[in-house]
């Protein structure tokens, strides 16, 4: 029973960590990354469609993304979607390819992005701690129902705490890497 709780806890904490990585990867650095445009929706036959389904996005160089649209009739819609996104990008089309130059980040913008990253990291840690609380509640319920002894409860809570500490450390590592990426010119 305790092993099931630990396994579930680990899976849920891993999901929280992956969600954090996903959120943070969308925060723009000075470097061109295709994942930057992942959140963009394009108007396609009357419905919002993810950009990835109508175009191929590649990093042309360190500061330019190339968007190769599959259907030429969508070029203007894709350009408009990129332009109206809150990323502050200015695309230009050349045939079936749309080039998206990334402007250099100002020092002030970098600081703002670091604040956002730290906030995301704190949310990730809160999610992990909530998973720990749920696991500890389940363990306490087992003790209350006399399915485990107090020693087993204490041991299980210590193990859950070790798992939690490991994931909080991983969150800190992800945050440090992103901050370093944001500060690198």
Curated annotation (Swiss-Prot):
Record bears the keyword Protein biosynthesis: yes
GO molecular function: ribosomal large subunit binding
Pfam families on file: RRF
Domain of life of the organism encoding this protein: Bacteria
Location in or out of the cell: Cytoplasm
Alphabetized UniProt keyword annotations: Cytoplasm, Protein biosynthesis
Alphabetical list of CDD domains matching this protein: RRF
HAMAP family the UniProt entry points to: RRF
NCBIfam families per the UniProt record, alphabetical: frr
Family: Belongs to the RRF family.
Protein's UniProt name: Ribosome-recycling factor
Organism name: Haemophilus ducreyi (strain 35000HP / ATCC 700724)
């Amino acid at each position: 029973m305790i092993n099931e709780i630990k396994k579930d806890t680990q899976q849920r904490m891993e999901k929280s960590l992956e969600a954090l990585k996903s959120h943070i990867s969308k925060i723009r650095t000075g470097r061109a990354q295709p994942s930057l445009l992942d959140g963009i929706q394009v108007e396609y036959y009357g419905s919002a469609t993810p950009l990835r389904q109508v175009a191929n996005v590649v990093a042309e160089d360190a500061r330019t993304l190339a968007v190769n649209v599959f259907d030429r009739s969508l070029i203007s819609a894709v350009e408009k979607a990129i332009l109206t996104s809150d990323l502050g990008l200015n695309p230009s089309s050349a045939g079936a390819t749309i080039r998206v130059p990334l402007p250099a980040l100002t020092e002030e913008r970098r600081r703002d992005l670091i604040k956002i990253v730290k906030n995301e990291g704190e949310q990730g840690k809160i999610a992990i701690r909530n998973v720990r609380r749920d696991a500890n509640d389940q363990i306490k319920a087992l003790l209350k129902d006399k399915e485990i002894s107090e020693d087993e409860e204490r041991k299980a809570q210590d193990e859950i705490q070790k798992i939690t500490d490991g994931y909080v450390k991983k969150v800190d590592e992800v945050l440090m890497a992103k901050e370093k990426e944001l500060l690198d010119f």
